[in-house]
Amino acid sequence: MKNKYPHIFEPITVRRMTVKNRIVMTPMGTNYGEQNGEMSFLHINYYEQRAKGGTGLIIVENASVDSPQGSNGTTQLRIDLDNYIPRLFKLCESVHKHGACIAIQLNHAGASAMSSRIGMQPVSASDVPSKAGGEIPRPLEKDEIMHIVKKYGEAAKRAQICGFDAVEIHAGHSYLISQFLSPITNKRTDEFGGSAENRARFAKLVIEEVRKQVGPFFPIFVRISADELMEGGNTLEDTLEYLQYFEKEVDVFDVSAGLNGSIQYQIDANYLPDGWRSFMAKAVKEKYNKPCITVGNIRDPQVAEDILAGGDADFIGMGRGLIADPEWVNKVEFGNVCDIRKCISCNIGCAGHRIGLNQPIRCTVNPAVNSGEDYMKTKVNKPCNVVVIGGGTAGLEAACTAAEVGCTTFLIEKKAELGGLASVISKIPDKKRLADFPNYMIHRASKLHNLFVFKNTSATVDMVKALNPDIIVNATGSVPTLPPITGLHDLVDKDGTNVATVLKMIERINEYPEDMKGQKIAIIGGGAVGLDVMEFFTERGAEVTMVEMLPMIGNGLDPVTKCDTNAKMAKYGVKQMTNTALQEVKNDRFIVKNPEGEIEEIPFDYGFICLGMRANTPVLSELDEAFSDTNVEIVNIGDSMRARRIIEGTEEGRNILNVLARHDYL
């Protein structure tokens, strides 16, 4: 059968490395390493899963060339000493046996390091933090610069000894080489600062030293921020200029974008379209006639194919997409595109947990980042009936997982459609990518002959009893939180009123005009939902006021979303009222108490109550009572246990495997 995506599966040779297809797993931190910087066996398995899934080239996440000074994480990989070679050798062996090539990214964090982790003041080109509010680094002396150059070369040689097929030098994303390249962070007046040629000198010396150490046949990749997307930073045109000073020994450019201060363009926000950066790779490729990797929210294989066919890039880089589905390449190659579990770019598990919380990565759509779909190999050892109440993402995950291991499974959903809150929120234009997850889950459910779905059906005790359950999963979701505030319950979500929850707003979404200049919007609640409402109306030109009881709007958001929403609030002039509490609701104004204890009125054309969600358990207590004298276990998962994020519900849905094991079905 002829493959629909011939360009994706065309091999390519770079020096002596031949890659079997054009899909590259781009480097992305995991926090899976050991605290001493060694590669853990969990870590090795993580990369092997992606190699088994068909990925052509895996570029391992950034490894420190000079620890502790150059480290940017408590579990970051190290390649600065020979004692790290054995585990890295094992990694290369594990990836190679599946036909994939493997490279490793070499890096020095510079000012992106933290003194609390490295035990010393971070260093950089100048005494400029790598992001607003960051630590002030110490400018490097010339002899220190040359020492670091040598460390890059030594690290590259180790990579070669380990069995890596190539190395990538990280020259973007606010790490040390980027700090020299960027006029934002490089204020030097010596031969390493000022002109583009001088700012590129450090990168040039590093690349030349790496080439000297690895010889003429070993591929060198360089990752760049082609456009820093910050005021005063390098534009694409600036980058095209400075690349001339070190492109000679570079075999492949990995063309990214953004700095720490524009992280929403570095780790793409979810509203950015598939392949939005590909024009940057095309510009680099056309000027320097070098193979280029393009990255940027690429989830759809047709987009990837079109980029390659159009000559915009030579490789398609995927980081989060392969966290979400290690089998992405195999599914595309063998015609199972509908089975792809697409990343929704929520940045919660991969960026939020890793960067914000310094924890190992997780994934909203993939509850088993390391083990993939291996659980399906084991089937229940005796008949088991599982009844799942609620067809949102948590309920769907539980139902599908139970059916996939052989349970006879019944899914009961009150509404006409499956997908729950994720499907609803995806109707907000900037959140449409979110629909990929419930759509995938619905498709997955449709393929399971032992999963029976009842829609437009309210679960009752009698109905559940009739299905003879061995295990019951309650996944009935959540509803908006509406506290007992004067006027609120009389007005919110009522016909003819101007006060609504986000659910009612979405129901009316097509009624709001595209041009809302001069109209006033007031939002009570500065969490994720309130910010979604803010984005919708500011983009239509409305004047928006946000009210939050806490000292900060966006508390608890992942760093990518937080940076993005802060930028949007500044761009659109959103009025932020923090430490402010709602006292009364009227049809054209909110009455609030400000931090000084004074009463204020906030007039609006439309007012929105976005105070989060609360668990909704309409039948749980009845089920508990009805099955109290039986061996039937009832588990409550997702938002119906406690309103949180999709990621927790997905994990709890997959945990049906633990429930089955507890009852000796597995």
Language model segments and positions:
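Short amphipathic alpha-helical segments
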Residues: 37, 71, 305-306, 329-330, ...
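A Rossmann-like FAD-binding core segment of flavoenzymes
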Residues: 435-481, 490, 495-519, 539-625
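A conserved FAD-binding loop/helix module that cradles the flavin
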Residues: 533, 557-558, 627, 637-666
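Beta1-alpha1 glycine-rich phosphate/pyrophosphate-binding loop at the start
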Residues: 388-456, 481, 526-560, 564, ...
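Glycine-rich dinucleotide-binding loop and its adjacent helix/turn
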Residues: 366-379, 447, 453, 481-540, ...
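Flavin-dependent oxidoreductase catalytic cores
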Residues: 1-389, 393, 397-404, 408-409, ...
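Short acidic active-site motifs
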Residues: 303, 459-463, 645
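Short, contiguous acidic/charged loop-to-helix segments that flank catalytic cores in large enzymes
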Residues: 267-273, 376-378, 383-384, 424-436, ...
